[in-house]
Structures are given as C-alpha cells and as structure tokens.
Amino acid sequence: MRTFTGGARRAGLAAGTLALLLSALPPANAADLAGGGPRWCPTVAGHRVDCGSLERPLVAGEPELGTIEVAYAVVRHRGPGAARGTVAVNPGGPGEVAIGKAAEFAAGLEGLEDHDLLLVDPRGTGKSEHLPCGVTDAEYRFGTRQEQRDAVARCARALGPRARGYTTAATADDIDAVRARLGVRQLTLYGLSYGTYLMPVYASRHPESVRAVVLSGAYPHDFDPLVRPSAQAVSLALRRVCERSVPKACDGEKAVRDLATTAARLRERPLTVPITAGGKTYRERFTEGKLANLMFEAASRGVGMDPAGPSLLGSAPRALDRFVKGDTGPLRHLVQEEGSSGGSEDQAPYIAVVCNDYRKAWATDAPLTVRWQQYRKALAGAGQGGFGAFSGQGFNEGPTDGGDVCMSWPRGNTARPQPTDLELPGVPVLVLSGDLDANTPDANGRLAAARFRGSAFFSVRNAGHVPELEPTGCVTGVTSRFIRTGTPGDTSCLQGLAPIAVTPVGR
C-alpha cells in the first residue's frame, strides 16, 4: 500500500521501499559490461543490462482504445554459465518505478550471482509509456478529503475509457508478456508493499510461469476496506517502541492516550500547517484523517533503516505529549518534514489502479447516494473500538488508497474490482512483515501468507514497512537464501535487530 518516495509514489510511492536500503549497499567493483537496448537502459556496475519495450493492448479485447508501450530491463547475473533463475521485482505503488532503481536492486541481491533480475516499469510509469490524468502527487497528498475525492473524479474524467487500462491484472499480464519475449520459463516473484498485491495476481493468472514467491510488507486481496488492522497497529507500534526503548524514553500506554486526545482535538479543530515541497508552499488542513495517515503510513516508512537515528515513529511519542500539553510545534515539524517530499508526479497509475481494483465498503455498481449510505452503514456497524485511538470516520479519511477516497470513481468507463478469491499455485512462498509496520501490519501479512499453501511467514522485530530496509543484511540474507534454495534457512537474526531510537518524552 502506498509509500511516498521523496516525491514519487508509494507504496509505493515508497521512501524507496527496498530501493532506499539497497542504495546504501556497496556497488559492485567490476567494470560495467556492455548490454543492449535503448539509450535509457541503466548502467549497473559489473553487470550486463539488456533493455527493451513491447507494445501491449491498453485494454485486452478493446483494440479501439489503442496500445501502450511497456519497458523492461534485465540485469544479468555475474557468475559464469546460464542463469539458474530470474527474479522479477516490483517495488510497490501502485505506480512505483523499477528500472530507475536497477543498480540499487542489483546491489541488494548481490548474493544472487547466478540469477538474472527482471525489472518492468508498470504502464504509466518510469520508462514505460505514460497515460496521465492531470492530478499531481502534491495536490492529491495535501488536499482536503473532499479535494482528494474531487481529484479522483477529475482523474477518471480525464482518462475516460482508458481508465480500464490501469489494473493489476493488466500489469501482471504485461510482466508475463515480457517473460515470454525473453524466453524465460519461470519467474521467482518478489513483491514489496503493493507488489504483494500484484504478484499473487500474476501467480493466479500465470501459475505455470511461477517458480517461487517472496512478499514483503504484505496484505491480502480481501483486506478490510475500513482499514481496521492498520488503525489498531498504530497503537501497538507506539507501545512497542516505548517498551523497547533503551533507556526507557516513554510510556506506551500514555503515548496511546495522547494519540487519542490528539485525534479528538483535531477532529474538532484541525491545524493549518504550511508545507514546502517542490519549491511550492501548500497550506495543509491537518485533520484527524491527516494524523491517521501520518501515523499509520508515513511513520511506518523507513523504520529500522537507521536504528540509532531519528525517525518519525521514534519522535511521535514526544510530539503527541507536547501537543496534549498545548505545544503544537513538534507535531507541526513532523508534518512539515514528512510533507517536504511531495512532488509533481502524475497520479493516474496510482488513483486508477486502487479505485479500479481495491475492495470497497460499498457496491461499486451502486449510484453515488447509495454508495454513501452503504459506506456510512459499514462505519456505524464497525463500532468505535475497532479503530484504536481514532474514530472510524476520522481514520478512514486518512488513507489515500482507501476509506471513502474512491467514492466518486464512476461506474462507467472503469474496470471491475480485482477478484479476491485467487487460485494460487503450490510453490514455495516466503512472507515477511515488520512488527512496527502499521501500513501493512503483521495481521495483514499473516492473512496474505495464509492464501498460499505451505507458505512461511516471519515477523521481523523492530522493523517497519518493508523490513529489507534494515541495515545488517539479516533480512536480505534470508530472502536471498530462500530464492536460491526454496527455504529461508536460519531466521534467528530476524528477532535480533536493534530497537529504534525514541526521543525522550521528558525533554
């Protein structure tokens, strides 16, 4: 689910998801090897890189809507002889680029000297052909909830029937078309964040082409459309960071009470916070929903990447304490710091995929008035206890890929939701989750793992969204071993990562 990357999309737009960690790893020392392909083909030290693109139908079975170019890069293995396999990586989103992170991904999978790495930029992103709708990252991110819903409707109008071309199934089929062109018999699928939604769809549509699956920061296709696991995980993460802090920096129960008080005050009286991003200044109306987004999504990103350094999650207990005591400064600072990465990227690949595919709390074929009735009934039936420190309505105004944000996505010209009852192949599957991640919490990771027969699920202590970001190499060692052998081997290090630094509340 969505993660912002210094102005790019998540999830998925991620703070690079895996790529941020990988960019910190040492590059190969060997000279670059000559590859083949267009001028945009990336250079990866010590590896040959072959690139290309292929023309794909925008919407299968509707030739009148035209075609779209999908770009790919293959980072060839370093060792002698033929590759033992090919790993296809998707870093999240929807809409995160892959090819632009080729060097970082290759460094992160450096142990796989006998495997090739396949990177496909999803349609509408990176080196693939773009199909914009005129909604930017910053305006969507910083807008009020009504403005976000209006942006969704505007995006749909701009795309028209072409909106049907933005689906997870279409991206999965694009990847398989690339696989077929390359003559690769089977892929090991590696999905991060939204990639954990995409790769099972690929596996269900092309089971004979799947060798194994790795999912990191996972969630199931039939996830709760009211996002209750994430709401509850925010409180759990606050309790855990306080409990594990050395020396003890905060009281977890007090931090949760402070969060509830902050949410209630913002529900009644939002803040106005100026945010500078991309050379522009925006005035964000910081509501309970914006607090929810800050705490479940942004605060989960990059946790554990630098355990001793500052982080949003580690700073949150003190900021909440100060807010309750009348000092809004620390919380404002966190909002401004997190928002500074807002950018100008077009959000069509993000908005259209989540509004076409994701499960909703209403019938997508219902008229707008009925949708609102069904949504409000679902919220009322959920009760208040299921949303942790937040109100149900307030929390559901936080997700940019859920809650009520797709309410105005039209019935006409759009795709049917992605089916949730996937038939999946019986291949080796590894699922990882960070136990401080409220974006794709352990509860959702376990549900995602349960969809595969015989899968292995591991919760990584003191890690956030996409645990490969941790710096010791423990997690990437486990995943590399799994890709090579089909088993994770010794996983004891997953419970031994250092706790994150927490700003003392007393200061």
Segment roles from a protein language model:
Residues 1-31, 54, 175:
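Secretory targeting and sorting signals
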Residues 33-290, 352, 358, 362-507:
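Gly/Pro-rich cap/lid or specificity-loop segments adjacent to the active site
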Residues 162, 245, 297-302, 337-338, ...:
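Alpha-helix C-capping/helix-to-loop hinge sites
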Residues 219-237, 321, 328-343:
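Flexible "cap/lid" loop of the alpha/beta hydrolase fold
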Residues 258, 262-265, 315, 319, ...:
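Charge-rich, solvent-exposed alpha-helical interaction surfaces
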Residues 269, 318-330, 337, 362, ...:
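Short loop/turn hinge sites at secondary-structure boundaries
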Residues 274-294, 300-302, 340-348:
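Structural motif
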Residues 297-321, 360-366, 487:
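Short helix-capping/linker segments at secondary-structure and domain boundaries
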